[in-house]
């Protein structure tokens, strides 16, 4: 398959198809998905680490505000999972993985810039925390994408690695 090939017919349950070409395509997609999902998880959980150090860096947020910054990525990620699960069939797995992974740059770079100034408004931090939820939403899309490629007898291993 070339880089621009669109899968027209995929039947991983057909042993002949799986042995001929299916396993190679599935394996390639899995190994590309694993680092993308690791990055998504890192961005999603970033606030759990950042919040602990904000007071020492001079940020004067209340305890309540710090808890909100920690909770918002999970709330946003849980909501986005609904939409991301349907995105893969609509736009394609390769395009989804590329766009979803690229979208993680915005919160990652944003946090890197925001934590340099203790006068960063709390509202900006809330926006960045919500954007980190993109990482959580990536999980649903990634699982839907990878499970499509493997026969049911191998989906558990693939999803576990992913």
Regions found by a protein language model. Name each.
Residues 63-64, 152-162:
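Loop-to-transmembrane helix entry/capping segments in MFS-fold secondary transporters
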Residues 102-119:
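C-terminal ends and interior cores of transmembrane alpha-helices
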């Amino acid at each position: 398959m070339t880089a621009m090939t669109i899968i027209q017919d995929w039947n991983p349950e057909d042993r002949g198809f799986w042995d001929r070409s299916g396993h190679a395509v599935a394996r390639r997609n899995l190994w590309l998905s694993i680092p993308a999902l690791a990055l998504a998880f890192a961005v999603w959980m970033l606030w759990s680490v950042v919040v602990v150090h904000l007071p020492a860096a001079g940020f004067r947020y209340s305890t309540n505000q710090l808890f909100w910054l920690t909770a918002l990525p999970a709330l946003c990620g849980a909501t986005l999972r609904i939409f991301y699960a349907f995105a893969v069939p609509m736009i394609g797995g390769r395009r989804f993985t590329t766009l979803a992974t690229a979208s993680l740059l915005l919160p990652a770079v944003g946090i890197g810039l925001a934590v340099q100034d203790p006068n960063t408004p709390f509202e900006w931090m809330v926006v960045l925390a919500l954007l980190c939820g993109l990482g959580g939403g990536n999980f649903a899309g990634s699982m839907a994408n990878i499970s499509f490629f493997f026969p049911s007898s191998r989906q558990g291993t693939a999803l576990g690695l992913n």
